[in-house]
Amino acid sequence: MNKRKVKNVLFIMCDQLRADYLSCFGHPALKTPNLDALAAKGVLFERAYVQSPVCGPSRMSYYTGRYVHSHGASWNFVPLKVGEMTIGDHLRPLGVQSAIVGKTHMRADLSGMARLGIDPNSKIGRRIGECGFDPYERDDGIHPYSGHDPEPAYNQYLRDQGFEGDNPWEEWANATVDDEGNIRSGWFLKYSNKAARIPDEHSETLRPSPMPVCSSRRMPCR
């Protein structure tokens, strides 16, 4: 491939987004105009299915193009074994630099690398630990348990934009406005340890749920 013809590709992967909760798929109340615009200008797949209800294995299927029972990463933090080719590995020989930004819930196959004599801190070892992608800005959002840098570069970027704090991601980017108009960070939001644990008084309502395009604090994007 001629490197001059290589184009940038931005692949956005949403976590826990149901297709039938998009107005372009016919939801009667929820309005998703920005996603609708993308669907209208592009290709809308009406019969596309994730390969696992668990997010990590499903991501590995996106990366490898294979079923969960084939790539073997059957749960969050189950390593994708050494030698498993991903889209990052396939694109690199074509002159494309591929990187992951955000979370992926994948851990390196340390035992596999040890068996093959690969240094986890080497260039190839770090790529294996990032699903075949180049290390960039990894943040699985579960500090300090993820084993990754608890002070990602994005936090310093937010401070440089004037969003001060010990953890600007939590205090500013991951913030919302409550019913009284007060700004609440993710630390104070309701924690539900099971999906859709909605209080009875809020379980049925005629008021459509808001789906903001960006943070109420007008977070800068990078």
Name the predicted role of every residue range:
Residues 1-222:
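Formylglycine-dependent sulfatase
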